[in-house]
C-alpha cells in the first residue's frame, strides 16, 4: 500500500477554490483525499487531451457546477492546478478557455 500523498495547490487554484461554497469545498476535499490515497472518487475523471495523470473533479452543487483539476504524476505530491466555477448552463463539457489555462 502506498502512503498518502500530500496535496499541494497552485496559488490561483487555491484562491478560486476558497470562493466555492462550504459544501462544495468539503466534497472536493473528500475527492482529493481519495486521490491522495491512490484511488479515484466517483466525481473524478481523467481529463482528455492533457496526458495521463491529470484528472478533473466535476461537482454539481445547488444548481451550479464547480471543477477542480489535479495532477498525480508530479513527484510525490498530488497537485491541484486549477479550480473554477463553470458558468455555462449548457452541456457538461469543460470550456476550452478553462482547459487552455491548465
Place the predicted regions along the sequence by residue.
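Basic, Lys/Arg-enriched alpha-helical interface segments
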Residues: 1-65, 74-77, 84-101
Amino acid at each position: 500500500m502506498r502512503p498518502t500523498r500530500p496535496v499541494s495547490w497552485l496559488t490561483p487554484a487555491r484562491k478560486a477554490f476558497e470562493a466555492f461554497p462550504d459544501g462544495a469545498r468539503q466534497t472536493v476535499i473528500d475527492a482529493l483525499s481519495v486521490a491522495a490515497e491512490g484511488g479515484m472518487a466517483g466525481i473524478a475523471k481523467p481529463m482528455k487531451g492533457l496526458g495521463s495523470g491529470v484528472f478533473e473533479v466535476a461537482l454539481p452543487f445547488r444548481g451550479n457546477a464547480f471543477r477542480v483539476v489535479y495532477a498525480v504524476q508530479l513527484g510525490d505530491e498530488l497537485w491541484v492546478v486549477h479550480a473554477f466555477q463553470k458558468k455555462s448552463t449548457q452541456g457538461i463539457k469543460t470550456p476550452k478557455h478553462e482547459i487552455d489555462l491548465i
